[in-house]
């Protein structure tokens, strides 16, 4: 570590209990996407205590700025740091002392940790404005779990002046203390779809007089997998998953209507576009073949998350200096979980780091995200906060 990194890291360590308290507060009081009003208020309260100017963004999000007082040659740089803040509609089944107090809702994806770590980073950065020139933009993004927030923040113009973007995500399948930072594809795109199939009802004993929407839907489900296995290069990363199917009204009536919902996930914009076009064609033509019709509705949750090569190399340099070679992972299997921080990177070159939060000695920290027993090893909060702080300061100083 450099002398500056050592100083900043010591401050992050000293604030560990503060960040843990914040994280546990957010964990006890989870709020779903676009409902994060109390969370927003708690963030604002902490920023007020720190004397950091802020405003609301994307309805339930928070935007803040910290301007450095150091001087530099040339145009000062600007970086945006991001944390997502929404929870999930899951009933928590484990029983930590900070268990969710809201029935049917919990932080099962680490967003409570991201939120707390960014507040902790803001506290350190604000106390060390003399160490950097330029400006740090802080965004607490709502609604990530439903593909909301990122685009709304971008469209507000809040991050237009940024030259770099940086975000983190807890990773239960990475040991606490380690960081994953790799260039290029990290996360798949996420597109939601609903296919409605229209048939013709009739008595089950006279199938020739009806058009069986349930049968058509089942054929679409099976055929959709051939778009992956028979229409896509085996080395390309594509997933088509169907999670719900509903059809018919009773046992002895041919289903007149059927509906299914699912997701398409791809690692490149080209493959994403191709898969969506082919699935829509398949659904409509399959329905027509059996005398029915189909319509497909889409919602874009997230683009493929592609870490910028230069920004990732910069963040890797910071991470290597902070944590050492053995704790920085620069290549691993890509994830089919999406994150609309991808929109930030498309707007402002940036990097997204996975922060290890799993500890085999604490089994709940190793279960998958979106599990009712999910938890994090809170030592990961220090790693996340240190990354936010040190990468931002070093980028603004032109040291990475």
List each language-model region with its residue ranges.
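Acidic/His- and Gly-rich active-site-bordering loop/insert found
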Residues: 2-107, 112, 116-132
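Active-site beta-loop-alpha junctions enriched in small/polar residues
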Residues: 31, 84-86, 143, 171, ...
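Divalent metal-coordination and catalytic microenvironments
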Residues: 26, 64, 81, 111, ...
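Histidine/acidic-residue-rich, glycine-tolerant segments that coordinate divalent metal ions
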Residues: 88-90, 94-106, 112-113, 119, ...
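Metal-dependent amide/peptide-bond hydrolase catalytic core
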Residues: 218-400
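General structural feature for long, well-ordered alpha-helical segments within catalytic domains
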Residues: 4, 15-18, 22, 35-46, ...
């Amino acid at each position: 570590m450099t002398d500056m990194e050592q100083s900043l890291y010591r401050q992050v360590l000293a604030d560990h209990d503060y960040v843990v308290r914040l994280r546990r507060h957010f964990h006890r009081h989870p709020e779903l996407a676009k409902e994060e009003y109390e969370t927003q208020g708690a963030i604002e309260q902490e920023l007020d205590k720190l004397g950091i100017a802020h405003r609301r963004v994307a309805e339930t999000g928070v935007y803040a700025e910290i301007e450095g007082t150091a001087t530099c040659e040339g145009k000062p740089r600007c970086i945006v740091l991001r944390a997502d803040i929404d929870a999930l509609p899951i009933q928590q089944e484990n029983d930590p002392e900070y268990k969710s107090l809201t029935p049917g809702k919990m932080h099962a994806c680490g967003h409570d940790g991201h939120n707390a770590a960014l507040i902790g980073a803001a506290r350190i950065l604000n106390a060390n404005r003399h160490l950097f020139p330029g400006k740090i933009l802080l965004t607490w993004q709502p609604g990530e779990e439903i593909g909301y927030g990122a685009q709304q923040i971008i469209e507000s113009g809040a991050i237009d002046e940024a030259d770099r973007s940086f975000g983190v995500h807890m990773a239960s399948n990475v040991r606490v203390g380690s960081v994953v930072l790799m260039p290029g594809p990290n996360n798949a795109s996420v597109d939601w779809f609903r296919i409605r199939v229209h048939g013709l009802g009739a008595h089950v004993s006279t199938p020739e007089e009806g058009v069986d929407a349930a049968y058509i839907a089942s054929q679409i489900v099976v055929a959709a997998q051939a778009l992956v296995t028979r229409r896509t290069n085996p080395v390309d990363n594509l997933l088509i998953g169907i999670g719900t199917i509903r059809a018919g009204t009773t046992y002895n009536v041919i289903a007149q209507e059927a509906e299914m919902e699912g997701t398409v996930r791809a690692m490149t914009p080209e493959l994403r576009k191709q898969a969506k076009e082919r699935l829509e064609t398949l659904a409509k033509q399959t329905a027509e073949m059996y005398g029915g019709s189909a319509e497909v509705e889409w919602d874009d949750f997230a683009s493929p998350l592609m870490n910028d090569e230069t920004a990732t190399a910069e963040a890797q340099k910071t991470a290597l200096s902070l944590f050492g070679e053995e704790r920085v992972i620069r290549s691993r299997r890509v994830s089919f979980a999406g994150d609309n921080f991808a929109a930030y990177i498309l707007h402002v070159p940036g990097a997204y780091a996975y922060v290890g939060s799993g500890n085999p000695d604490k089994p709940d920290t190793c279960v998958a995200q979106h599990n009712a027993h999910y938890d994090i090893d809170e030592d990961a909060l220090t790693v996340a906060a240190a990354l936010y702080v040190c990468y931002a300061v070093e980028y603004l100083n032109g040291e990475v």
